[in-house]
């Protein structure tokens, strides 16, 4: 594996190399360039599996860094036939202006750009994901057979799935009170975390995974693979969702007792107009999961406790816990007419997300014994175009906290 770091800040290069060392990448595999011009020279002469670019970058030695330096290099790489394209590219910067100027170009090419700073850790997780993928590919190509790969995986009692590294996965790690260890397996590009959850005298083995991207497809594939490999008794998803305005408030929690794909159906023409005819399959939570959700929804003392212990921002009042249907769809919804159209599929529907049904369906179709599924999410917007980014951290915290309590009741009773 060969890695090219393009960065003129020595402090940041040292931090990046620290992550590479943790992933057991040797110094011989790492090349550092301090300008766009020197990086291009390296890319013309050699192939690199991973390219790490600083966004605030000078073009040549002696020139001042430019806010578009990293983006200009990315465009040059994609434009030229004289450059060997790396398999993966990751953008990093501590300059917020450069970050804002580069996000659109990076996302358009399906690459990530992350902020680096004293309190920022997402970039390290993202980099570790890339490294583990590349290492897994190398090991797989080193004649690891499928049976050898699968036999190295431990089984677990609980599998946690989060759609976002930050704030969802970081909140889950924080509230669990455990030391989560990064684990990887030969031939598998995924990165997992393993821990033992302690509930008094009882210990529950747990593995968590973060989706490579949001959405039903990523959630279904990731969950199905993890269920097959780790054989959990329970699959849990925590995080954030949109809620139905007027029936819930920002910060409220939804424990899903029913979920479906609201985009399942067909488009047809009626009197010259295109009409959508829904035909969803609805997956219901087990009676046992539903019972635990009902318990939590009535535990006002627990809700008040978690509200008071919340770090950082919190809503003006203690949130409510609703046990209700949660629909899923493949696209982010951001217009005020959305709920009025979808609620016809299930009049008690209270929220929407992009993953819950995929988790439920992966459990439904799993090899025997099929695991139960549990989805607990917090409302952070109303799918009407209004956003409050402050509430996302609280929503991730409160949903993860309640999920931990639910796991205790479901596994240890």
UniProtKB/Swiss-Prot annotation:
The modification 4-aspartylphosphate is found at residue 54. SUPFAM superfamilies: CheY-like (SSF52172), Purine and uridine phosphorylases (SSF53167). Residues 2-129 form the Response regulatory domain. It holds the Pfam family PNP_UDP_1. GO terms for biological process: L-methionine salvage from S-adenosylmethionine; nucleoside metabolic process; phosphorelay signal transduction system. One of its GO terms (molecular function) is methylthioadenosine nucleosidase activity. One of its GO terms (cellular component) is cytosol. Keywords: Phosphoprotein, Plasmid, Two-component regulatory system. InterPro entries: CheY-like_superfamily, Nucleoside_phosphorylase_d, Nucleoside_phosphorylase_sf, Sig_transdc_resp-reg_receiver. PANTHER family: 5'-METHYLTHIOADENOSINE/S-ADENOSYLHOMOCYSTEINE NUCLEOSIDASE, 5'-METHYLTHIOADENOSINE_S-ADENOSYLHOMOCYSTEINE NUCLEOSIDASE. This is Uncharacterized protein y4jS.
